[in-house]
Amino acid sequence: MIKKRQTRIAMIAGEMSGDLLGAGVIRELKKHLKNVEFIGVGGPQMLEEGFQSLANMSELSVMGISDVLRRYPQLYFIRERLLKEWTINPPDVFIGIDYPDFNLSVETRLKRQNVKTVHLVSPKVWAWRQKRVYLIKKAVDLVLTLFPFEESFYQQYDVPAQFVGHPLADLIEINPNNADLRKKYNYKPDDTILAVLPGSRIGEIKYIGPLFLEVMQRIAVEMPHVHFIVPIACQELYPVFFKQFQARYSHLKIQIIQGNAREAMAISDVVLTKSGTATLEAMLLKRPMVVAFKWSKFTHAIIAPQVKIPYVALPNLLANKKLVPEFVQEKATANSITESVLNLLACPSQSNLNKQFTAIHHTLRQNANEKAALSILKILETSSA
């Protein structure tokens, strides 16, 4: 039986996607636990569910090795402050949401203190630095995976893991109808729209923002009738992108909005996005896309030799074949990306692609938040036994 005293659940989300996942799990856990406290680090979505954040989530947001090295003292201070708090007043369970390097170090320390640990969202050990699986095995009591191939990977190493599905697959309809949304953004039904997503971190926008602006400029020349909508993930990122826009591209007619990335993709004909969760959302919305990724040469030189996967776009990884065009690092040029986007804009109706996207959608639609919450409740029961 779960203890009648207040249940204390510690969580850390390091970025916007983790905040969204954390909020969903909190919502489900509250249905089962009436006297519960959620503490740690989270963003606005988790805060809306009653989460108490002990640090600003944006302080944890880093991209690439150089950014980690530069901000290591700050990250170290936050981690040690949290661990001190949880040593004095241990949680019943700790849930690390993605953000693996930081969360695994916290999980390792807490597990030594007999705190139950769950990691939600598998670190990409199947992609690179595979030896981390042995650290994960020591650090966590359970890994909750969003994709089926991840559960199979962990089974090879006897790591407790459960595929719970992806919350976005539950949230987004199998056959979405987004015609009415166009009115909200003052677009006509027959307008051709390109949604452009340059990233959700400062480091991503630094490298990808200028590239995507150059692509938009070239598309505007070739297809002047195309409308551009650019959702910026949060308020802190807006001035970063706007400065890039003002520097050389202020003549472009771009609708820049704060947040609402899913709506921007939903009303679009084609999506241009950096790799990451946005590629999954675009797939679930059944939108053809072009995917690009770029980071510092220093980070790329260190990480690239360790990468063990043929693709970076999630639709390609889930299908185990190239469904959507993707361009990484030196291949991510304005010429190559523009050509691919123009091809899709010329023929946005992709019935075969839509069928494959739909099949993957069904696989991922598992009522993920509920499955994750039930797994966490089982862990709580063992901790209180």
Curated annotation (Swiss-Prot):
Reactions listed under catalytic activity: a lipid X + a UDP-2-N,3-O-bis[(3R)-3-hydroxyacyl]-alpha-D-glucosamine = a lipid A disaccharide + UDP + H(+)
Keywords: Glycosyltransferase, Lipid A biosynthesis, Lipid biosynthesis, Lipid metabolism, Transferase
GO CC list: membrane
Pfam families for this protein: LpxB
Pathway of action: Bacterial outer membrane biogenesis; LPS lipid A biosynthesis
One annotated GO molecular function: phospholipid binding
Segments crossing the lipid bilayer: none
Origin superkingdom: Bacteria
GO biological process per UniProt: lipid A biosynthetic process
EC number(s) on file: 2.4.1.182
Entry function: Condensation of UDP-2,3-diacylglucosamine and 2,3-diacylglucosamine-1-phosphate to form lipid A disaccharide, a precursor of lipid A, a phosphorylated glycolipid that anchors the lipopolysaccharide to the outer membrane of the cell.
NCBIfam families attached to this UniProt entry: lpxB (TIGR00215)
Name this protein carries in UniProt: Lipid-A-disaccharide synthase 2
Source species of the chain: Legionella pneumophila (strain Lens)
Gene: lpxB2
